[in-house]
Amino acid sequence: MKKHLHVIQSIVPGSIAEEMELQPGYTVLAINGQDIEDVFDYHYLVNDEYIEMLIRTADGTEEVLEIEKDYDEDIGIVFESSLMDDYRSCSNNCIFCFIDQLPKGMRETMYFKDDDSRLSFLQGNYITMTNMKDEALERIIRYKLEPINVSVHTTNPELRCMMLHNRFAGKIMEQLQKLYEGGIIMNGQIVLCKNVNDGEELERSIRDLSGFIPNIESVSVVPVGLSDHREGLYPLEPFNREDARKVIACIEKWQKKLYEEYGTHFIHASDEWYLLEGYEMPEEERYDGYLQLENGVGMIRLLTEEFHEGLKEAVTDGKKRHVTIATGHSAVGTIRKLAEELCEKFPNVTVDVYEIVNHFFGEQITVSGLMTGTDLKEQLQGKDLGETLLLPVNILRSGEDVQILLDDITIPELENTLQIPISIVQSNGQDLVDKILGRGEIDE
């Protein structure tokens, strides 16, 4: 196997590394005589009061640095690769995978599927664990890499193998048991597919996973996302209102039972289920501290609570102001309601809220995070958008240039087409209040 070179990209000012005169371009070869596989080896080995670091300088000279420091003090090295290793790709062929449903012609990086336990720890990514051997699980336990976020989908071994198209997928309960016995904190995710892993299979999954409380802190249930680009893929149906009612009833039944037994609600329906059925969002206490926000669980409740808190303290200078908010179908009702509340308090402010229909991925895709520049251009061009267009931060591609949308259209390009400045709203209600009122419009 090719050994990965751990090349220093930069040095943190004022750090031990700067004091030791380490330079970008140097390579870290070993610590305390041990080779470094990746970022977790590195952090585990540097957590000591005395270490010996073998480095190679830019001219090829190797030398050992003796470093004395506080036990958990960071050395101050930034490596060229944040993982200090290659990213591990997904070995599954899931029947619900959204990447398989992307339209052709997007940037190549959009089609990369990761399934890397290190990204689960570092970035909160969800992993299936199908590409993990026992040694990898033992490493997670040894290094106490938690929380680990697991894409479970079903605890039925045969069904999981079918859904993931992977013969190793049926070991999920044994893998979770090993992490549970190792004391690792976890979160789970179930992407629900109609007539596949719902109904009795969902009941089974919740029952099985609840056996790992308290180490599994929460599990989200999310409806499968279906784009218009599913040619040749497994035939999946969208959920309807009656389906949503049944899913919510199942989850709320288990929430009541588990809260009485363990003091945690544990299993959570994503906001999409409540929007599809037309129910009010659960009260804040039911979200157990919003452990599943990244899966769309509690986002609307949290946004609403934060918005109301921000609105209580808000003031304006009395000048007239007109802004536009663009959002997807899922959130449009909530955003309009919040905008009306603000305008009632501040009659000098006008807020127009436009629902953007997703033609790029397909009209069944209704979340704001998958809005594209193409659809924004087509549906907003020529309209009176006021002084500023507000867009949610989750439409920007993460990990890359923050000014780029999913379809490679940039914010400056969009501003030029629509002839209006764009302000990016962070994922909290306070920032929405501030941006509507014109406070803090210089984006990060």
Predicted feature residues:
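Structural preference for beta-strand elements that scaffold enzyme active sites
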Residues: 147-149, 185-187, 218-220, 266-268, ...
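Beta-strand secondary-structure signal
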Residues: 52-54, 64, 149
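Conserved residues at the C-terminal ends of beta-strands
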Residues: 100, 151, 222, 270, ...
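Extended, hydrophobic interaction surfaces within ordered domains
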Residues: 36, 52-54, 78-86, 268
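Auxiliary Fe-S-binding modules of radical SAM enzymes
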Residues: 1-31, 35-38, 49, 57, ...
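Solvent-exposed segments in extracellular or luminal domains encompassing
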Residues: 42-47
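Conserved Radical SAM active-site core
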Residues: 60-62, 69-215, 225-254
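Short secondary-structure transition/capping segments
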Residues: 38-41, 160-163, 199-202, 434-438
